[in-house]
Amino acid sequence: MKKLTKTHSHRQQKLASIINEALIEILRRGKMLDSRLFDCPLTITKVIVTTDLKIANCYFLPFNTKLTIDEIMDALNNSKNAIRNFITNKINMKFSPDIRFHYDHGFDNAIKVAHLLKDL
């Protein structure tokens, strides 16, 4: 019998947790980051690591910012090398995963569903 949900290994979950903590720390410090991120509070909503541990998909949600999502994505991608170096120092692995940033549409989708249910 096949499982309906995809489970993540212990190593994936552990690495995702370490990356999440490191992202929070480097965003809080703000050193070596793109200057546009200084006045842009971000929440890291989740980190998903691929099964081969080579890619970490990091989902974020901005709060009270004048920047567009594209500007935030550009600033995060400009800071990707500094973030990856910081994470490399936190983990004890042969390879450091490639960090990929994604806007988390979960809250937008929840609002849309709430409006649809309200209209019923």
UniProtKB/Swiss-Prot annotation:
Its main location: cytoplasm. The keyword Cytoplasm applies. SUPFAM superfamilies: Ribosome-binding factor A, RbfA. One of its GO terms (molecular function) is ribosomal small subunit binding. GO terms for biological process: maturation of SSU-rRNA. It comes from the Bacteria. Signal peptide: none annotated. The keyword Cytoplasm applies. Monomer. Binds 30S ribosomal subunits, but not 50S ribosomal subunits or 70S ribosomes. Belongs to the RbfA family. One of several proteins that assist in the late maturation steps of the functional core of the 30S ribosomal subunit. Associates with free 30S ribosomal subunits (but not with 30S subunits that are part of 70S ribosomes or polysomes). Required for efficient processing of 16S rRNA. May interact with the 5'-terminal helix region of 16S rRNA. This is Ribosome-binding factor A.
